[in-house]
């Protein structure tokens, strides 16, 4: 009888990959076959997941076995009574969760769930994974564990990959895997950087390095002229380190390097990404970022020469590293100072070269240095970003002795990320609780992270308690509500949604500081402590400009913060402080978007039915969230929508986000380097902080996979 049933199942159920592929084929009426993808989910669960899952007679037996066999971390479970743990697992399994798309289910079972050590059988379903994440992050707090479970199962909150993947496992990686480190202009710092690249890449980390402080090619060493090799050999060493330490062969290490636009090596730096670059200088796997101050744009407008300053001389004359000097502010005096060597380059030629390289490779990322620092409420200077260009935090230099031991441990940066699904968050029965739970969950990631192999990362995290609460599914939500991406209603909603998120996130951080009697280091020197930060919200009219958006917030039962609420929050923050130095950052969200059935981040879809290359599996198809055959007109893709509307949307969010947002620009295949330059200038004028990749329509044919940091993009 069992054989007959199996035969019937095979006959009735098409191969789940074939069913999923039918998303890419219209039916006889010319309609997209959304039902085939739902059938693919059912077939995948029935014919692959269930037959390959280990079953237990009870949850108690399951937990005992997983602990005894070394799968679950017993210390996580021991913070609670076993009765509570079993009750929470039972609660999770009665939530009614089901995957909305085949790609979501496929991603979860191939990349996230706990498997037997031979990799052949599944030990968790989605509810199990969520429960273990909640138990880990709540650290013994039963109320928080229940709230985290509900927020994740409802699809409102989704921790980033390293957290969601590793929580509760006995054999696990770090809960965070995105790092930013400075390199100073000495061999000890360079040596430490290569070691840090190895250590962090071994742990699956994506690491960005600041190169701006390194002396240029031809600079003196010990006063002997023309001795320095510049930044390119350091880039080569870092690239080799990432290639070597590739997480047990599972994934190539991921690295990025940032260089200031006024560094003398800037053109050589950019040329490393040319398709026809000499192999001696070509950089194949490192991501590149350029830090551009306001003065560069002003010089380009005037068609003037831009000076490139020797970091060696600037540090010698100013007594501080090049990256810590505000170039726009000191530009004229740097030009006039004869003690500082300089080269000259036409500013428009620089932007032309920048666009040419982006046209060829999609790189470099851009950080608008002065925009970032004007918006920064924390004392100190921001001089770099990360592998996905959304982390923007202050850092400080470390010093080493000749043994590479620290004589002064500076502060480097790690990113503790997770995202809210905008559509489900707007549907939340308690918007305030959703945001508070997410902030508390991410704060737990910071509190639990100890990267001892790189002491400056450990010190920076301990001092800042920084987190990055992100957002996803903006396009999906707007389309569900009948709003076109980039329309006046869409911009109005984006502004007010992030406005509301900001108030609730800050309030939660204030509550954490009050509960713990502790703020982030440097709070007293911040614009939060002085109350200055809140001025923007105590002025102006922060209410809906369109009737449609007013209706959305009313229907969701969300009270937009009033001036009185902001004034009270300001007073509370000035009295108690805030616990987290940084609260928001919007990453690109790759795999977690698919699991959550969300559009990525806050940018538009790249296709109505996205085609993903999934390793040996080949092509997998993903339909945009909330899309039906009746509302297709609301699902213009990013190439059709164009750069300006994307920039306008990000500008509305940027005014509220204390860190950055991963902003990819999409261009049709008819675009020129002039179009790219115009978009860069428009983004600068609109107050955008960073630009991520440049994508041209023909590049999408190669596949839509994101090469970047697993913490952010996947």
From Swiss-Prot:
Keyword annotations: Allosteric enzyme, ATP-binding, Deoxyribonucleotide synthesis, Disulfide bond, Nucleotide-binding, Oxidoreductase
KW Signal (keyword) present: no
Site features described as Interacts with thioredoxin/glutaredoxin, chain residue numbers: 709, 712
Site keyed Important for hydrogen atom transfer: positions: 178, 415
UniProt-annotated site: Allosteric effector binding, residues: 185, 215
One matching Pfam family: Ribonuc_red_lgC
Annotated SUPFAM superfamilies: PFL-like glycyl radical enzymes, R1 subunit of ribonucleotide reductase, N-terminal domain
Native source species: Escherichia coli (strain K12)
A GO term from the CC aspect: ribonucleoside-diphosphate reductase complex
PROSITE patterns per record: RIBORED_LARGE (PS00089)
Lineage, uppermost ranks: Bacteria, Pseudomonadati, Pseudomonadota, Gammaproteobacteria, Enterobacterales
Quaternary structure, from the entry: Tetramer of two alpha and two beta subunits.
Name of the protein in question: Ribonucleoside-diphosphate reductase 2 subunit alpha
């Amino acid at each position: 009888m069992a054989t007959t049933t199996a035969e019937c199942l095979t006959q009735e159920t098409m191969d789940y990959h074939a069913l999923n592929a039918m998303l890419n084929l219209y039916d006889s009426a010319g309609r997209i076959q959304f039902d085939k993808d739902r059938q693919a989910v059912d077939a995948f669960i029935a014919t692959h997941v269930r037959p390959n899952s280990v079953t237990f007679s009870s949850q108690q037996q399951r937990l005992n076995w997983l602990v005894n066999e070394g799968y679950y971390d017993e210390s996580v479970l021991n913070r609670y009574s076993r009765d509570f743990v079993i009750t929470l697992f039972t609660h999770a399994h009665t939530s009614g969760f089901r995957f909305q798309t085949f790609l979501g289910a496929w991603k979860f079972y191939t990349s996230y769930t706990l498997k037997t050590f031979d990799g052949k059988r599944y030990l968790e379903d989605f509810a199990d994974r969520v429960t273990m994440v909640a138990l880990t992050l709540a650290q013994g707090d039963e109320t928080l564990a229940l709230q985290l479970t509900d927020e994740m199962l409802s699809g409102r909150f989704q921790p980033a990959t390293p957290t969601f993947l590793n929580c509760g496992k006995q054999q696990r990686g770090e809960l965070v895997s995105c790092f930013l480190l400075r390199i100073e202009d000495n061999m000890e710092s360079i040596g430490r950087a290569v070691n840090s690249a190895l250590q962090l890449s071994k742990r699956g980390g994506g690491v960005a390095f600041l190169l701006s402080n390194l002396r240029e090619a031809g600079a003196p060493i010990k006063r002997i002229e023309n001795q320095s090799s510049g930044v390119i050999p350091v880039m080569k060493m870092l690239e080799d380190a990432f290639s070597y330490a590739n997480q047990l062969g599972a994934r190539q290490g991921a690295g990025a390097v940032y260089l200031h636009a006024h560094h003398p090596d800037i053109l050589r730096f950019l040329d490393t990404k040319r398709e026809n670059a000499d192999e001696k200088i070509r950089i194949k796997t490192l991501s590149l970022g350029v830090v551009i101050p306001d003065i560069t744009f002003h010089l380009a407008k005037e068609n003037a020469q831009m000076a490139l300053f020797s970091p060696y001389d600037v540090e010698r004359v100013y007594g501080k590293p090049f990256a810590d000097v505000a170039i726009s502010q000191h530009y004229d005096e740097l030009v006039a100072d004869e003690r500082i060597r300089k080269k000259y380059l036409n500013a428009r030629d620089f932007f032309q070269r920048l666009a040419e390289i982006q046209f060829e490779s999609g790189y470099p990322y851009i950080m608008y240095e002065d925009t970032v620092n004007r918006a920064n409420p924390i004392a100190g200077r921001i001089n770099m970003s990360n592998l996905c260009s959304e982390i923007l935090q202050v850092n400080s230099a470390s010093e080493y002795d000749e043994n590479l031991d620290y004589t002064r441990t500076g502060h480097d940066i790690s990113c503790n990320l997770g995202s809210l699904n905008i559509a489900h968050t707007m549907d939340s029965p308690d918007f305030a609780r959703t945001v508070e739970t997410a902030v508390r969950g991410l704060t737990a990631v910071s509190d639990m992270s100890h990267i001892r192999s790189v002491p400056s990362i450990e010190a920076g995290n301990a001092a800042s308690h920084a987190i990055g609460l992100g957002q996803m599914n903006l396009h999906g939500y707007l389309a569900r509500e009948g709003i076109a991406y980039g329309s006046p209603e869409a911009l109005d909603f984006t502004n007010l949604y992030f406005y509301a998120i900001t108030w609730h996130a800050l309030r939660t951080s204030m509550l954490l500081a009050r509960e713990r009697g502790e703020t982030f280091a440097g709070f007293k020197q911040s614009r939060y402590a002085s109350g200055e930060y809140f001025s923007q919200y105590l002025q102006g009219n922060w209410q809906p400009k369109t009737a449609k958006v007013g209706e959305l917030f009313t229907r969701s039962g969300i009270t937009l913060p009033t001036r009185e609420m902001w004034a009270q929050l300001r007073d509370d923050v000035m009295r108690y402080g805030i616990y987290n130095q940084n609260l928001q950052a919007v990453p690109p969200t790759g795999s977690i978007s698919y699991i959550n059935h969300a559009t990525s981040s806050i940018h538009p879809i790249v296709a109505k039915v996205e085609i993903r290359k999934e390793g040996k599996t080949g092509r997998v198809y993903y339909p945009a969230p909330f899309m039906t055959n009746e509302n297709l007109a609301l699902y213009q893709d990013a190439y059709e929508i164009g750069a300006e509307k994307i920039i306008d949307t990000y500008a509305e969010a940027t005014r509220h986000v204390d860190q950055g947002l991963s902003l990819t620009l999409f261009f049709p295949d008819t675009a020129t380097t002039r179009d790219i330059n115009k978009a860069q200038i428009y983004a600068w004028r609109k107050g955008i902080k960073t630009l991520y990749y440049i994508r041209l329509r023909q590049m999408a044919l190669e596949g839509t996979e994101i090469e970047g940091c697993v913490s952010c993009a996947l």
